[in-house]
């Protein structure tokens, strides 16, 4: 991770740690850089960069700032307006854009925002390009064998254009609809749009496929995105599904790159359930290439036990859909994701896509003629206790011999009945201690043992 860009973009509180000036500079660099790459390849046409945003009040400010920077550098800016992160990735890839930009802080509260950069393949922008952006922001850019204390401005007819590109968002919606291989007619579906990016897309897609669609949290006002809504506050959808007697519910986050489900009984279907359900579905049809589902180290122990019973292999990556996709692309895997609901179907998308995930879950229900509760039933989620310990030095705490010995003792005691995971937070001075076991008391006992050692060694703040 760099100074500004983490695993999921440049994120911070709008106007404090992420400002309009930052956005302008990101636009200035990207517009200039992609024009320069074109010129080096003998292409005199201006760079084309597509931009989407979520519903936060500050997203409009950042959109205008990015457009100012891009056009000042001579690039053309194409505006999808309010849309989802996966739609930007899709359009960047299929419409031959130099890159894509999504303005969103995903599941964070309204006062945060972020800038996610996407390359021309619809994938997260390479680290080396992000480092160049950061160097320009800090006034120390060196690229093309030269220092660039300032970038040239475009002038006259070379100033970039701004293009209303809502047609791109509509094209993405058409693509999603085309993936629906069964009619949804007669199925009562609940959608929680988190007052975010999916509010003007998800219902239209489900309606087009014939569902009886009921929606909550689809009235964004700039301040209510993720506010007791969406996949991080799924209790609202649970209640809605039960009260309305719906067949299934789907909850998205602020930029709709993740999805969690609610079955007809009001139970939460996590990302681990989704991986299990679709992994089994693909294996039954002989389409689970490499016989592997890609997970992260945070997936539940019960998922791996269930995969073992089904004869399905699995891989574990670091936390972050970026790492999941990297493994999938390198090893030819078709499905992977996170417990949080970032699910990647590599045949159809290059990033997690919440609406696509919900369509795929509908496909399994309709193909197997089973309710969601029955599809999820074989997966037994193990009780989990997770404690975040704020420490003075997270690396020293995790690598301390006494801490490692305590972790080893717990792992030995659990054997094949559970697991312990101790890892550093990527963004905070925190060590996370997590235990999964057959019962909650066992989890708590072993978490306490490790946390006590961290405290005894003087690391806890």
Q: For the regions a protein language model found, what residue spans apply to each?
A:
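Short glycine-rich phosphate-binding loop at a beta-alpha junction
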Residues: 42-54, 188-190, 291-297, 432-434
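Gly/Ser/Thr-enriched, mixed-charge loops and adjacent short helices
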Residues: 13, 113-242
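Gly/Ser/Thr-rich active-site loops/lids in small-molecule metabolic enzymes
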Residues: 126, 215, 267-286, 354-364, ...
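An N-terminal, well-structured beta->alpha segment
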Residues: 1-68, 72-73, 162-186, 395-399
């Amino acid at each position: 991770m760099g100074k500004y860009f983490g695993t999921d973009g440049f994120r911070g509180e709008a106007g404090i740690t992420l400002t309009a000036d930052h956005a302008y500079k990101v636009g200035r660099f990207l517009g200039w850089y992609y024009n320069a790459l074109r010129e080096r390849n003998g292409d005199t046409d201006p760079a084309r960069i597509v931009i989407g945003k979520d519903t936060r009040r500050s997203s409009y400010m950042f959109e205008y700032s990015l457009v100012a920077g891009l056009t000042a550098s001579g690039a053309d800016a194409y505006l999808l307006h309010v849309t989802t992160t996966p739609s930007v990735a899709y359009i960047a890839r299929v419409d031959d854009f130099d890159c894509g930009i999504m303005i969103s802080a995903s599941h964070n509260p309204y006062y945060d925002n972020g800038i996610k950069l996407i390359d021309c393949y619809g994938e997260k922008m390479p680290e080396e390009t992000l480092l160049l952006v950061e160097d320009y922001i800090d006034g120390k850019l060196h690229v093309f064998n030269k220092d660039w204390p300032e970038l040239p401005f475009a002038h006259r007819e070379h100033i970039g254009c701004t293009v209303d590109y809502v047609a791109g968002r509509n094209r993405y919606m058409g693509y999603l609809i085309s993936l629906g291989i069964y009619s949804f007619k007669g199925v009562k579906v609940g959608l929680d749009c988190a007052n975010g990016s999916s509010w003007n897309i998800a219902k239209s897609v489900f309606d087009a496929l014939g569902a009886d669609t009921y929606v909550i949290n689809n009235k964004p006002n700039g301040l209510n995105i993720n506010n007791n809504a969406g996949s991080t506050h799924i209790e609202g959808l649970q209640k809605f599904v039960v009260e309305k007697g719906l067949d299934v519910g789907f909850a998205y986050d602020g930029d709709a790159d993740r999805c969690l489900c609610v079955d007809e009984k009001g139970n939460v279907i996590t990302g681990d359930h989704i991986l299990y359900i679709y992994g089994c579905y693909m294996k039954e049809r002989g389409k689970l290439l490499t016989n592997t589902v890609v997970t992260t180290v945070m997936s539940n122990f019960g998922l791996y036990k269930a995969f073992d019973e089904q004869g399905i292999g699995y891989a574990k990556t670091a936390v972050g859909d970026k790492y999941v996709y990297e493994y999938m692309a390198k090893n030819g895997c078709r499905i992977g994701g996170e417990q949080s609901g970032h699910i990647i179907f590599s045949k159809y998308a290059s990033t997690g896509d919440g609406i696509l995930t919900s369509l795929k879950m509908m496909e399994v229900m309709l193909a197997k003629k089973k309710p969601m509760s029955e599809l999820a039933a074989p997966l037994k989620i193990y009780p989990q206790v997770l404690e975040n310990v704020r420490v003075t030095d997270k690396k020293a705490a995790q690598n301390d011999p006494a801490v490692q010995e305590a972790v080893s003792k717990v792992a030995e005691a659990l054997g094949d009945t559970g697991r312990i995971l101790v890892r550093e937070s990527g963004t905070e001075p925190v060590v996370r201690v997590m235990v999964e076991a057959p019962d909650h008391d066992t989890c708590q006992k072993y978490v306490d043992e490790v946390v006590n050692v961290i405290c005894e060694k003087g690391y806890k703040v």
